[in-house]
């Protein structure tokens, strides 16, 4: 069985496309916090371990998604939780979020021993200019190096990529797709940039008069009415079409399919092949 758990609600980073601070900062100004200070709280390792123990012993849970926006951040906190999982003998398969610039060498083996089988990384874009414009600052060399050490410890990787950030053009989006294909993560998510209400990008879109969806369905990544942001160089329809073609390119890549069959087996390979046989219906794709 599977369950979610939380260890560190909130996020200390300021990526402008993200709306996570909308719920976590709610009411904090009344408590005296500055608007510029993002909300991020640590639950004690003992509390987290007690929750995980309860899930295992009472409910028979073996698969846990740590639903934090950023679990792998503070080495002392993460290492204490990982050490406790090992000491308590909790037989878990764990999925969690990380950033390429937060995974310290001291964490990797501890994460693997504790049962962390998947880490999801927000790589977002290959262009440092595009990333810097949305306050996502790291270089491609760090991306490659971090993923190598994580996968070297036996932890599988989900790469998350965004097409259509404000500085994107066809060339930079192709660079992002090329990086995704090169990294060949065990799974990948391809998103269009959306100005989600509550995000700094939403406020920027309002201020600059960028077109926004007329209904909540337009904010859905996979809906017929999905309407991403245009960029300084591309229409929303062009971004949407590129994203959908990038999905097909990645998941039909022979190198990726060979890796899936080798790591996960023929049944999973068949599921991936079946997935790419279905194209999303889009109203606004150019």
Where on the chain are the PLM-derived regions?
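Radical SAM [4Fe-4S] cluster-binding motif and immediate context
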Residues: 1-158, 178
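Residues in well-ordered alpha-helical elements
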Residues: 46, 141, 170-174, 237-240
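Short linear capping/connector segments at secondary-structure termini
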Residues: 67, 162, 260-264
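Short glycine/threonine-rich loop-to-helix capping motif typified by GTGT followed
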Residues: 74-81, 171-173, 268-271
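Conserved strand-turn element in the central/C-terminal portion of the radical SAM core barrel
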Residues: 99, 126-134, 147-173, 191-197, ...
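Catalytic cores of alpha/beta
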Residues: 107-108, 167-182
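Radical SAM enzyme core and accessory elements
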Residues: 200-207, 211-286
């Amino acid at each position: 069985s599977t369950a979610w758990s939380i260890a560190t609600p909130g996020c200390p980073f300021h990526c402008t496309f993200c709306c996570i601070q909308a719920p976590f900062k709610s009411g904090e100004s009344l408590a005296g916090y500055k608007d510029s200070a993002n909300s991020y709280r640590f639950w004690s390792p003992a509390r987290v371990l007690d929750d995980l123990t309860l899930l295992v012993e009472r409910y028979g849970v073996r698969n846990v998604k740590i639903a934090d926006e950023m679990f792998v951040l503070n080495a002392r906190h993460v290492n204490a939780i990982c050490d406790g999982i090992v000491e308590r003998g909790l037989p878990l398969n764990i999925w969690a979020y990380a950033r390429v610039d937060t995974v310290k060498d001291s964490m990797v083996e501890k994460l693997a021993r504790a049962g962390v089988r998947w880490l999801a990384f927000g790589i977002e874009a290959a262009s440092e200019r595009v990333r810097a414009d949305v306050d996502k600052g790291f270089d491609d060399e760090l991306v490659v190096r971090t993923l190598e050490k994580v996968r070297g410890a036996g932890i599988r990787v989900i790469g998350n990529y965004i097409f259509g950030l404000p500085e994107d053009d066809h060339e930079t989006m192709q660079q992002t797709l090329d990086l995704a294909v090169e990294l060949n993560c065990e799974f990948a998510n391809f998103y269009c940039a959306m100005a989600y209400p509550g995000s700094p990008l939403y406020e920027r879109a309002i201020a600059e008069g960028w077109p926004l969806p007329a209904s909540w369905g337009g904010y859905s990544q996979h809906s017929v009415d999905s309407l991403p942001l245009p960029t300084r160089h591309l229409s929303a329809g062009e971004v949407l079409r590129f994203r959908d073609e990038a999905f097909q390119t990645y998941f039909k890549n022979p190198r990726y399919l060979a890796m899936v069959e080798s790591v996960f087996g023929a049944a999973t390979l068949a599921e991936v092949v079946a997935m790419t046989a279905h194209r999303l219906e889009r109203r606004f794709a150019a």
